[in-house]
Amino acid sequence: MHPEPIDELRTATFRDLDTTSLYAILKLRADVFVVEQQCAYGDLDGRDDEPGTRHLWFTRDGEVRAYVRILNDGDVERIGRVVTAKTARGAGLAGRLMEEALTIIGNRPSVLDAQAYLVDFYARYGFRPTGPEFLEDGIPHIPMRREPQGSAATSSLTERRRPV
């Protein structure tokens, strides 16, 4: 009997990304956001290589199975490009990445633009809608914000978090 393969968490700045990992990350983003969601848009937005950007992903046997990007937007951290490979969905990787991202962010406010059907997922991690639904590349999104831990808005959420 062989042990179950383990997903390895990796983190890097753009400068620290090797070309193989960068290619696998960009391929996953294109496979899901462009091909699967049928959304032709410019994924390469010039933010991946900013000095404050952090890349987090799970890999198994050389395959990037889930990914998230954290941008430093001055007074807030911006979470984006949250993506899970079709073959890895249901394994809880997106939730584990969110927990890791929030650990890295620490006691700073964070924002994201959630695809509308994922609002409840992000709410599990303390995010709350901050504006009306809008279309981005034809997909409904809702702006969300998470206040630093310990504030009145988030202090009761830690106990309610559950894995994805």
Listing of model-derived features with the role each one plays in the protein:
Residues 2-48, 55-63, 158-164:
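Short amphipathic alpha-helix that is part of the acyltransferase structural core
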Residues 50, 75, 136-140:
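Short acidic/glycine-enriched loop/turn segments that link adjacent beta-strands
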Residues 57, 63-71, 76-83:
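Conserved beta-strand in the GNAT
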Residues 84, 89-103:
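Conserved acetyl-CoA-binding loop-helix of GNAT-fold acetyltransferases
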Residues 103-116:
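Conserved GNAT acetyl-CoA-binding A-motif
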Residues 113-140:
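Conserved active-site alpha-helix within GNAT-family acetyltransferase domains
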Residues 149-154:
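Short, charged/polar, Gly/Pro-enriched secondary-structure boundary elements
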